[in-house]
């Protein structure tokens, strides 16, 4: 297990977001990404809570932002090196953003992002 501060982990998440092309991030709408401590089930690295873009209708307005939760301690627990942490953060952030865009777990698995 790797040790790092929450602040450093936040920087890794920011770096992962910066690696996503603006052509995609420009379409992210009403979503916040935050670090969380304890996942609802062991081994869960990230969680998207909200209404995917593909399911939003004309009446979608005045709602609280969707949330992407990154369970930082779970990620640290499965990684052996600092490089593993960077890669797992990137994969987890992209995976959860894909859910925001309406891509389900089966399709992510087909694409190699599960």
What are these regions (language model features)?
Residues 1-88, 100, 104-109:
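Active-site rim/adjacent substrate-binding subdomains
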Residues 88-96:
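Short alpha-helical catalytic segment bearing the HExxH-like zincin motif
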Residues 110-114:
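Short hydrophobic/aromatic patches at helix-to-coil boundaries
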